[in-house]
Amino acid sequence: MDWCRYRFRSVWDLPAPPSRVYGVLERVDEYPRWWPQVRQVTRLDDRTGVARFRSFLPYELVVTAQERRRAPEAGVLEMAMTGDLEGWARWTVQPRGGGARVLYEQEVEVRKALMRRFAVPGRPVLIANHALMMRGGRRGLSAALAV
């Protein structure tokens, strides 16, 4: 097992139309307004940006994200990531009942030296930290959609 590789999956059911949810998710530079753990997003061009994240643990992750796929008709947004994390992440938004089901998938390798150094003993803590970040994202997105 490569202790520095992670695969995450989160599913959120939201009481908003899929097109509205997708519209919020595709405006990546606005994530810091509703997602507390996304501290900053700086656009480099129309497909690339630098994001800074910090959840519960006292460290910051910095990644450069480049859009790989934007397909509103399929409800898919996908990006490649380099920097402290290297890999990809994807949002898939589909109709579900009267609202939307949001699937977030991510496969990354940790590149940040400190996190690599503590890969084995710190793995459960890093997974819990990610879960807290995703919980904050779900709550923030729900609140943003309620406005």
For each of these PLM feature ranges, what is it?
Residues 32-36, 42-88, 97, 101, ...:
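Glycine-rich portal/gate segments that line the openings of hydrophobic small-molecule binding cavities
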Residues 11-15, 42, 52, 92, ...:
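Generic structural detector for well-ordered beta-strands
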Residues 1-2, 36-39, 61-63, 109-112:
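Short hydrophobic/aromatic-rich motifs at helix boundaries and adjacent loops
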